Amino acid sequence: MFMGEYHHNLDNKGRLIIPAKLRDQIENKMVFTRGMEGCIFGYSMEEWQKIEAKLAKLPLTKRNTRKFMRLFYSGAMESEFDKQGRVNFTSTLKAHAGLIKECVIIGVSDRIEIWAKERWDSFEEEANEDYDDIAENLDDIEL
């Protein structure tokens, strides 16, 4: 399970270090794709296969399914970590997430998310204001 918040910068070649605490939970490879709210989602190969199986069951007759799958898969990249644990994202993913220099990497249970620091700060500020209300509306789980 992925968790935690880590701050790293893109290096001068556009590579980002994925923290060892996150890398240690997977093999040497992940799949990265467009995430929600302007971030990048990163999945272990095992988790990616589960997602692919779920997406394969969606009806292609639905326009929104086709749109989502096109964007989700066209932005996806399989990547191995280099010896320093770095990943070099495609220009498409960097543009989607607004990655320029400062990045925040967070663990979110079955995936990691990579955010531009400014976007993460904005999201976190807004979400923190609603945290109690959001939790209250999650009736299905009892924390």
From Swiss-Prot:
- Supply the CDD domains for this chain: MraZ_C, MraZ_N
Any one Gene Ontology BP term: negative regulation of DNA-templated transcription initiation
Q: Where in the cell is it found?
A: Cytoplasm, Nucleoid
Q: What is its main location?
A: cytoplasm
Its assembly, as annotated, is: Forms oligomers.
Similarity comment: Belongs to the MraZ family.
- Protein name, per record: Transcriptional regulator MraZ
The UniProt gene name for this protein comes to: mraZ
